[in-house]
């Protein structure tokens, strides 16, 4: 799968100042780009903690949530946000 936009993903991870998050984001990116997902179940097989919320996928990266749009036809994840649990729980990202 393609990840759009890789720079935004890593810039957001760096901005937290959390080196573990940067490592988790790199691991997620590696797994995401090595696979060719055709549906949510296939994503779940690689990322067991992923959730499908509205039209987005929410990945658990430790104490952060990675929110992506997805197009299985275009073979792409679309980076939307990388949020702490507290920010994620506020729900503003759903708009």
Locations of the language-model features?
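Basic, Lys/Arg-enriched alpha-helical interface segments
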Residues: 1-65, 71-78, 85-95
């Amino acid at each position: 799968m393609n990840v759009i936009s890789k720079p935004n993903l890593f810039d957001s991870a760096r901005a937290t100042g959390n080196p573990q998050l940067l490592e988790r984001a790199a691991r997620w990116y590696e797994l995401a780009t090595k696979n060719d997902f055709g549906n949510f179940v296939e994503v779940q097989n690689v990322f067991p903690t992923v959730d499908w919320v509205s039209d987005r996928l929410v990945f658990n990266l430790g104490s952060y949530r990675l929110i992506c749009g997805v197009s299985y036809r275009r073979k792409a994840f679309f980076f939307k946000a990388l949020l702490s649990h507290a920010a994620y729980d506020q729900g503003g990202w759903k708009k």
